[in-house]
């Protein structure tokens, strides 16, 4: 449920409830207010793509330029530091646009007045975290200046990369104050005071009681923040901060330390690269060429356009690695075309929404990257393990579409189809067809790591879109890079805050306690996996998949390991299960994206998608209880 690239409930508030930032200003001040962070994001994103692409190519080209194996030792470290900078610098942009991964199932049902009061609470809570990390990070930098440390490769003083924390959280505070000022004007004095009083009530227990058991604080505050509408990442960070204040089990500057070190990781960098690759290739015309090829192959059959749509979604999944990105890129092309050929618009939107969920199963997949990092499992094996469930889901959706279309009399398009037209479509789509070869071939051929393959895919998409197809203009290119940076930042910050939350859970032995409780009920593997699947299906209906993975992996993984489940197999189960949440009412993000493209009512669309969800559940059961099938390629 995450993202044009990553969001389960990416909330982009509109109308009366959204005019948070200050009014537009003319001239240079207005431009700075709207765009201050964006040039840094564009420069940083392009820099890390080029640096890691250079690292990958130089490793092999350098062999011929110099004797022996060649390696550019500085590239990875420099790319990691730039990656951390752009991840946090993108958050102020998200604040200004009010785009975040959040649970809004309760928020959306509130009257407008209470929604506006809720925004006051959200801004104050977020501002509290930003100000705290800003203050803590200044202490960290002071310590680095007093006791200098340098990075291994670049010999860079660590206070320089650590500067990202005061700079970015300072900018967040500025953007939040802008948003809060605008929200105060909307709410008026009385409702603003109500919001501030509610914030004080939220914080009061931490300062009134001498000691509070940390577990109720951790989970109680997190639940409260979700209900209020605080973004999930910020809720995790605030709940962790509240627990530190209440229990005193960790130093107060712990949050700032982990905010940096938790994402100082090369494998995590695959996420922005895969997102950028999907954005570049979608805007660069590759999705349209893939659809033409799929239509050439399947368009003559009953329900041919629906079959072509599913096939295109499956292949585009190997480019974008994202469900909503696939729905947005493919749905904007196929839903109008299906309606034009006589298909019901609700069926058209449902097919695209369900097929878009395959995007997180077929590699590359951002959820697999997140799980691999969280569980310390092989990302390469996870990628391979997602292939069979993704193909089974696609084939099941195709079979249903064929049967339903035949029943409704939706025939294929009648036109000349022969070897010449097929080869022409293949030739037109050749650059898109090369992407899985580059990514998967590079990984499983031992040529590149998943992160390097992702960087090369982003570089490839950029070159094809700008110079081969020439559909990425300067303006659209700039917007694409900003979009990719912003989307990936929401995921990265979520992982950062979830690491803090998870570390406190580990200190308080929460995973061990839950594992003992569940295993006390039964040690039967079938029953344990059934309970976990039901839990994930419930959570997937209201929480974004990536958030669920980073929160639940530390809790559930010890349980399945105790009953003998392979961690790679469990990762596949988890991702296939949470993929169903992309299309599960009431908050499946694929449904919302598809309904927006089709101009279809979400209530009616939710009914039409139910048979497709049933098919996806059948694939989940096969994936869970016949491990040889998903593990066929994963070994």
Swiss-Prot record:
The keyword Hydrolase does not apply. It is found in: Cell inner membrane. Pfam families: DctM, DctQ. One of its GO terms (molecular function) is transmembrane transporter activity. Pathway: Organosulfur degradation; alkanesulfonate degradation. One of its GO terms (cellular component) is plasma membrane. Its main location: membrane. It is a multi-pass membrane protein. Disruption phenotype: Cells lacking this gene lose the ability to grow with isethionate as the terminal electron acceptor. In the N-terminal section; belongs to the TRAP transporter small permease family. Part of the tripartite ATP-independent periplasmic (TRAP) transport system DctPQM involved in the uptake of isethionate (2-hydroxyethanesulfonate), which is then catabolized by enzymes encoded by adjacent genes in the locus. Thereby is involved in an anaerobic respiration pathway that converts the sulfonate isethionate to ammonia, acetate and sulfide. The complex comprises the periplasmic solute receptor protein DctP, and the fused transmembrane protein DctMQ. This is Isethionate TRAP transporter permease protein DctMQ. It comes from Oleidesulfovibrio alaskensis (strain ATCC BAA-1058 / DSM 17464 / G20). The lineage of its organism: Bacteria, Pseudomonadati, Thermodesulfobacteriota, Desulfovibrionia, Desulfovibrionales.
């Amino acid at each position: 449920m995450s993202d044009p690239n990553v969001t389960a409930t990416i909330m982009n508030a509109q109308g009366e409830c959204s005019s948070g930032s200050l009014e537009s200003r003319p001239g240079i001040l207005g431009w700075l207010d709207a765009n201050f962070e964006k040039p840094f994001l564009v420069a940083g994103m392009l820099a890390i793509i080029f640096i890691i692409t250079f690292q990958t190519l130089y490793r092999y080209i350098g062999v011929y330029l110099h004797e022996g194996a060649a390696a550019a030792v500085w590239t990875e470290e420099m790319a990691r530091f730039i990656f951390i900078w752009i991840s946090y610098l993108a958050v102020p942009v998200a604040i200004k646009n009010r785009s975040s991964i959040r649970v809004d199932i309760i928020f959306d049902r509130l009257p407008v007045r209470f929604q506006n009061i809720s925004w006051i609470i959200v801004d104050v809570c977020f501002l509290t975290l930003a100000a705290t990390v800003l203050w803590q990070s200044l202490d960290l930098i002071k310590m680095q200046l007093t006791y200098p440390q340098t990075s291994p490769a670049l010999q860079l003083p660590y206070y320089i990369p650590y500067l990202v924390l005061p700079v970015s959280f300072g900018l967040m505070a500025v953007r939040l104050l802008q948003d809060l000022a605008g929200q105060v004007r909307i709410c008026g004095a009385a409702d603003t005071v109500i919001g501030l009083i509610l914030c004080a009530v939220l914080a009061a227990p931490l300062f009134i009681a001498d000691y509070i058991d940390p577990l109720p604080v951790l989970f109680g505050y997190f639940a409260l923040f979700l209900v209020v509408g605080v973004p999930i990442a910020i809720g995790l960070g605030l709940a962790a901060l509240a627990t530190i204040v209440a229990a005193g089990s960790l130093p107060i500057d712990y949050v700032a330390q982990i905010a940096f070190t938790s994402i100082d990781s090369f494998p995590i960098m695959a996420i922005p690269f895969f997102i950028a690759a999907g954005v570049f290739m979608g805007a660069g015309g590759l999705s349209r060429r893939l659809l033409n090829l799929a239509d050439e192959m399947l368009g003559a059959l009953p329900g041919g356009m629906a079959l072509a749509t599913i096939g295109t979604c499956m292949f585009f999944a190997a480019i974008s690695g994202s469900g909503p990105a696939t729905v947005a890129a493919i749905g904007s092309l196929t839903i109008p075309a299906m309606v034009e050929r006589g298909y019901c618009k609700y069926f058209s939107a449902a097919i695209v929404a369900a097929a878009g969920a395959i995007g997180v199963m077929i590699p590359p997949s951002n959820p697999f990257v997140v799980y691999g990092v969280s569980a310390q499992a092989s990302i390469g094996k996870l990628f391979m393990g997602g292939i069979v469930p993704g193909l089974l889901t696609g084939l099941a959706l195709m079979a249903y579409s064929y049967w339903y279309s035949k029943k409704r009399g939706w025939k294929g398009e009648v036109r000349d189809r022969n070897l010449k037209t097929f080869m022409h479509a293949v030739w037109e789509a050749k650059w898109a067809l090369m992407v899985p070869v580059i990514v998967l071939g590079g990984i499983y051929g031992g040529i590149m790591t998943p992160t390097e393959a992702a960087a090369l895919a982003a570089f490839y998409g950029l070159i094809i879109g700008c110079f081969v197809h020439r559909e990425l203009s300067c303006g659209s290119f700039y917007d694409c890079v900003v979009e990719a940076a912003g989307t990936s930042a929401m995921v990265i910050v979520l992982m950062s805050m979830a690491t803090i939350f998870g570390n406190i859970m580990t200190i308080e032995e929460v995973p061990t306690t839950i594992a003992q409780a569940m295993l006390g009920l039964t040690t039967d593997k079938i029953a344990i996996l059934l309970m976990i699947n039901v839990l994930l299906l419930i959570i997937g209906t209201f929480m974004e998949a990536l958030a669920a993975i980073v929160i639940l992996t530390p809790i559930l993984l010890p349980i399945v390991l105790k009953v003998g489940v392979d961690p790679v197999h469990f990762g596949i189960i988890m991702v296939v299960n949470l993929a169903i949440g992309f299309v599960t009412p009431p908050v499946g993000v694929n449904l919302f994206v598809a309904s927006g493209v089709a101009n279809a009512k979400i209530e009616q669309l939710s009914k039409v998608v139910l048979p497709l969800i049933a098919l996806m559940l059948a694939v989940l059961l096969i994936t869970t209880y016949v491990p040889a099938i998903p593990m066929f390629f994963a070994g």
